[in-house]
């Protein structure tokens, strides 16, 4: 899911830079849905505080994507990309342990 989210944000950024409003909105919508899937997969009973923190972070990312869509701001897409990369790096590190 993380890779899919990163791809959708990158595609939205390209669409934004080329003035393709329809594609931008479509890709941002898909990225928001992917992050929603990540939120839904959180197990708050087992994950405790970590799951709660991730839920808040994912909600923040969804909000920033919506703002990027409304404001046409590439910087907000870049912000979400960095956050997704950091979370992905953390999960990848756990898997390698």
Where are these regions (language model features)?
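N-terminal intrinsically disordered, cationic/polar leader segments
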Residues: 1-10, 17-18, 22-29, 36, ...
């Amino acid at each position: 899911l993380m890779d899919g989210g990163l791809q959708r944000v990158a595609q939205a950024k390209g669409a934004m830079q080329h003035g393709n409003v329809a594609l931008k909105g479509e890709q941002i919508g898909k990225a928001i849905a992917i992050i929603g899937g990540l939120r839904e997969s959180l197990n708050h009973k087992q994950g405790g505080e970590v799951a709660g923190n991730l839920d808040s972070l994912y909600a923040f990312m969804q909000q920033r994507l919506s703002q990027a869509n409304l404001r046409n701001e590439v910087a907000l897409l870049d912000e979400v990309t960095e956050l997704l990369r950091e979370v992905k790096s953390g999960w990848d590190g756990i898997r390698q342990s």
